[in-house]
Amino acid sequence: MKKFLLFSLALISISTFSQSRKKQDWTEYVRSSIDPHVKVMLPLGDNFLKDSFDYFYGFGIGGNLNIYKNFGLGVEYTYFLANVKNGDKFGYLGSPSMNNFDWYVFHKDKITEDFFVEKILGYSTYRMKSPYLDNSGKFSEGNGGLNLGVKAIYTIDNEGFQQVVFGTKLNFYNAKIGNQNPDIADYYSKAVFLNFSLAYRYNF
C-alpha cells in the first residue's frame, strides 16, 4: 500500500510538472514586434496601372505576433503615392494616393544566431484616390487580392530586440471593373505588384 501511494504521488508530480512545462513552453513562443517601414511597389505586366504610373512609393507601420513556435500573424499599413506617366491612359485625373493593408500569416526560419527568414502568405486591401484635374472632387475605388513573399531579418543588437528587415512580395490587385470585352475588363481591373520594403523592427 505504501509503495502504491508513493507511485501515485510520483505520477501526479510528473503530470503536474509536465503540464506546467507545456504551458510555460507555449507562452515562451509568444512574441510581438513593431515595424516602421518604407516601400516601393512596381506594377508588372500588361495592365492599366503599369501603363499609367512609374511606380508607387510610400511609408507605413506594421505589427507581428509570433503565436506558436515559428508561426504567427501580421498586419502592415502603407500610404502610397505615385506619379502619372501617361495621362491619356489615366484620364482626367491627377496623381493618385493609395491606402494599403496587408494581412498575413508567416513562418520564421532561423538561419544563424543573427539571421532569420520569414515566409508570408496573406490578403491585401487597397483604396486608391485621385483628384479630378478641375478640383471638382476625387475619384476612388477599393479592391483586394492575395499577397505572398519573403523577408530577410538581421539582428543588430546583442539582446535581439532590434532588427533590420528587407522584404520582397508579390501583391495581386483586382478592382473587379466590368466590361463586355473580357480583355478590356482584365486590363483595367487586374494587376500584379512587385513590392520591396525596408523596415526597422523592435521586438518586445
Predicted regions and their residues:
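Structural signature of outer-membrane beta-barrel domains
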Residues: M41-G45, F80-V84, S124-M128, K169-I177, ...
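Bacterial Sec-dependent N-terminal signal peptides
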Residues: M1-Q24, F204
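Short glycine/proline- and aromatic-enriched beta-strand/turn motifs that initiate or cap beta-hairpins
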Residues: Q19-E76, F80, R201-N203
